[in-house]
Amino acid sequence: MDKKKGILLVALGTPRSCETEDVREYLKEFLGDPLVIQKPRWLWLPILNGIILKVRPQKSAEMYKQIWTDEGSPLMSYTIAQTEQLQGLREDFDVRFAMTYGEPRIDKVIREMKESGVEDITVLPLYPQYSLTTVEPIIQQVKKIDDKINVIRDFHQIESYTDLLAESIREKWQANHYDKLILSYHGIPLSYVTKKKDAYEAQCIETTRLFVEKLGLKEEEYEHTYQSKFGPEKWLEPATIDRIAELPKEDTKKVLICSPAFVADCLETLFELEIENKEVFVENGGETFDFVHPFNDSLEFTKVLSEVIEKNKVEVEV
């Protein structure tokens, strides 16, 4: 049967390898996106090309080397797995994937889908929460190709998503008597929320609210934080790494940490959270630091993606 409908999953992207030159090429595209770094081009590009791309790629490459696997980038491996599983669940669609930055490119994959006879494409960014820095670049790239293509903006309120998020934590939380659960979201500059009206912070807060209700957590049992601060500008707070350093001094020695904004392991989860933050916690007197990985290749998460597509299909038809 000819497949006339298609689903395109889109993740952030990843360097081709963990070698410095490949990391530099990736960072140049990512940090060069005016939606990611919202500064005047005349100011930002000389800083990016003259300073950051001369220093940061080597440092980032060393981080990537600590998380790289025999299959390559974990983010790439898990995105491929999610795509293959979703294709198995949705035989009525042609399911493919692309990356916002790097390969495979969004425009190339959409053109390939159209050339193969797919006429109705739905794009699903692999971000539960919308942000100007993550989902909007996907929307803009898609619009340049075909402004009639539907892009799903977020799915943080889908009950099956928050149910699965809670279930991924519940058993470990109940069995190990942690002092606190840390919900660490990727941060963005505060000005993107206050001046650009990015909905991201509000959607993260809503995700936490729905999640802790399902787990029945008391206010003192969890904290909502933001990670991955970049540059001198003020970002959303509190910063994960700052709280991780402070908690042992507040007699919080056993923590469980999760990352609800990520659906697949990547540098920010495997290195920043699981390695870097753990080291800071232990150095400051912490005793137990356990990390709950994102959904990765969980079939249950792929079923959530299928439900997101189905709900969107109904909404579009209505």
From Swiss-Prot:
State which Enzyme Commission number(s) the record gives: 4.99.1.9
Biological pathway: Porphyrin-containing compound metabolism; protoheme biosynthesis
Which residues does the annotation say bind Fe(2+)? 186, 268
Which cellular component terms (GO) are annotated to the entry? cytoplasm
Listed A to Z, the keywords are: Cytoplasm, Heme biosynthesis, Iron, Lyase, Metal-binding, Porphyrin biosynthesis
From the Swiss-Prot or TrEMBL record, state where the protein is found: Cytoplasm
Gene Ontology MF term list: ferrochelatase activity; metal ion binding
Q: State its role.
A: Involved in coproporphyrin-dependent heme b biosynthesis. Catalyzes the insertion of ferrous iron into coproporphyrin III to form Fe-coproporphyrin III.
Assigned protein family = Belongs to the ferrochelatase family.
What is this protein's name?
A: Coproporphyrin III ferrochelatase
Organism equals Lactococcus lactis subsp. cremoris (strain MG1363)
Name of encoding gene: cpfC
